[in-house]
């Protein structure tokens, strides 16, 4: 089945299955499996008479449409590159730095220009083998019982956070979880009286050598845990699925949360979350001396003395189960008219687990393009606006649910990849009221006080010395006119907190 065809089929499947029971959902999934149907039916037959495992198999197969990964052939295509990359890493002692990074980017650019890298997608529903799925189900049930911290979690949490073999779309299916379990079985999470958080820290400390790449080599394909271990460096999103594979292989209910765009900074971010005793506990994916800080610094209220101010418009959680809603559930909406964030069925909104939210009603004063039925709230970053929530247009207004406070939003329409203003931008205050930001012809002086967002980053400390000996001069007609300032020593960097 072609890629476009299977996406259409998955959309129709989700619409049908959301109204039926699990048996109907499974049957609809099997109808999409093509020549792979016998493999999936073999799993169901294998667990006949074992109620819980059969129900787990139903969950995995019923939600399998929409799950996909890289064709493992990409590893073969890139094997020579990975060897060259490792040699370069040895040269620099596997340390991330500017010279190393430039050579990594150059190495990948040269390799990808000279070699074919087949980054094709495999859909789980047409590729998953019975033997592999049975092994994953049996492993999940075994580690669930063995783990003293999670053995009493609900079956629903087990299915969503321990059971799934796929922790995020795009990864190739392999034996990573079985390998992780073989490495650590019996060492962690099996003795009563131990603190589960400290045990997780101890386990992740064993993988402290896996560090952030500093955004070098971002286009290099890393589609499985073994490749990330070989490369030693990656992005937050990659370390998150790695941790999710690792922890779930030992029975820890774990997921991946993300902010699609910051409300007061550039970029986005991804991190891990553990779900124990009905509560979620977020933590930094890479090794950090204060890794469990996110519920504290992502509360949309405080300014952290060390990390500065974070404002989050939304937090979503990747799921294995399918959740179709909004424009994606509307058969009258062309998929091309839906922002990429809302084309995925594998996520849920968990904003309220992190901060107080507010429902926002917006009067849409901008004319909507023909056929547009939904509006979006967007935040600004990297010189552009990024949609973070949707709402259906009704009588010229839209109600956006559970929005983060203390940041600026722009209501927009989305049509064929383009954004159009739907109303004036506004600031959502801490008390949930809206302050419209209307432009006019008046001008006035503005004094700007710059407060660094993350004052203690190691790189910032490193660069402070570079200012020594620098001077600032005023220019007149392109010629130096007057020296305004000279630094005779290194700068100091002091955290400033707004009260």
Predicted segments — roles?
Residues 1-25:
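Bacterial Sec-dependent N-terminal signal peptides
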Residues 215-218, 391-393:
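A generic structural motif
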Residues 173, 210-216:
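A structural motif
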Residues 36, 207-211:
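Sec/Tat-exported extracytoplasmic proteins
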Residues 19-200, 249, 299-499:
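N-terminal accessory/pre-domain segments preceding catalytic cores
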Residues 30, 46, 189-199, 206, ...:
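Hydrophobic/aromatic-rich core segments of domains that either
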